[in-house]
Amino acid sequence: MIRWMNHNALRTTRRLTMAAAGLVVLASIAPRSADAQRYVARADSLLRRGRVFAAETLYYYAVRRAPRDPAARLALGRYLAARGALRIGAVLMEEARFFGGDPKTVGTYLAPVYARLGDYKALSSLPGSPLPYAQRARAEWLGANLPSVEGPDSATITLYPVDSGSLGEIELVVGSDTIRAAIDPRVQGISLDTAWLRRKSVKQFAATFDNDWRNVGGVALSVGVGPFMLTNVPTGFSATGDLKRAKVGLDFLAQLAPTLNPVTHTMTLRKSGRIDRTAPGERIPTLSYPGGLWLVQRDGVWPLGGTMAATTLGTRPFTLNARRGELIVESR
């Protein structure tokens, strides 16, 4: 009887010890998580003020301070993806979900990163996906029919000047139709007029009982840009009233590492999408979000295409080096 009581007491003691140890661990984690959130908040504030490298340091420090804190990992992942490190950013956001982050919150930020990576299989199966049915169906189709680029190593095409509102215009060949597309930093991908919904050169994805064209996902089966031929290009639609007019975002051009020259009215494109690390010029950090491309300046962060960015660039040629999150501007 005494032996049984001693054994029972020992088991109780062990349970209490384990519970106490768990409380100690939780007590140590909570302050670290709170510290990490403060570092993230400070980093966000610094980033808005244009202090990109100081913000980066704090994002990293928040993750080191609380390695399993989902909010800290999500913040670092979002930052790195915006700076062009798409794959690393995606992995960090996936880890944020693994460590308890809300799948819908993480999915909202992860979906556009998967799209820019061209990882359509991951996009179509994303937990907590924010995508409507049409875009999920498009992602599934693109996962089995991957986009491609064919053409020379590099080529120069005409950049048509415009009065305002865009960075210029280029000619695209969609199917067998030649159209003029304005380069708009606020646009994602290619945006065609709704008249293209009736054309065979654009594949459509829509819910059976949804007649709203705004919810339709499209894929242009072929898009020519000068001597380059792009196949299976994700496409959106807008009611412009003109079949021959379109808009393209810098994310679409980024895959060809474009150099825009407002003086000679030309644009140089590169099939590899890569820029030599030793390329001369002033390097301006950029942040790429679904709402557009932003330039990081000493006095803040400004949208490319806005007045402040136009003042910074002037008429100098510039190259978008999306892989390294920078704009390379020709020296004055």
Question: What is each model feature region?
Answer:
Residues 34-36:
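Boundary at the C-terminal end of the N-terminal hydrophobic targeting segment
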Residues 22-31:
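Hydrophobic h-region of N-terminal signal peptides that target proteins for export
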Residues 8-11, 32, 286:
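Generic low-complexity segments that are intrinsically disordered, proline-rich and/or Lys/Arg-biased
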